[in-house]
Amino acid sequence: MEIKRVGSQSSAKGPAEWFTGTVRIDPLITAPDPALVTGASVTFEPGARTAWHTHPLGQTLIVTAGAGWVQREGGPVEEIHPGDVVWFPPDEKHWHGATPTTAMTHIAIQEKKDGKTVDWMEQVTDKQYRRR
């Protein structure tokens, strides 16, 4: 058994190649091999968002604070709130982040396939982001 105490893992700034705006990533689940699951609490300041990306085994988001937007490629931008759970199937191109005026925090859970949890793509443009 392993217990990770609150504050025992360092926060990381979301890298500019994967995010637009200010994003903080707080690791939650970093199970060692052979476990596949990983997870983090991710906080997006207003206007911040991910780049387009996919997950080889899908991704679950659990919104814990604020208001956010999510979109799958070709679909509408949808608003999400605390308590909402979002599932992106394997290899579904999507993005997620805060609304322009409200920060948003979610827990992101995904599994590793061949050691990889995500495939990052191009940035979400301001036009795509504000298409709501």
What are these regions (language model features)?
Residues R24-P27, T38-H55, P90:
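Conserved short histidine dyad/triad with adjacent acidic residue
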Residues T60, W87, T101-M121:
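A short hydrophobic beta-strand segment most commonly corresponding to one strand
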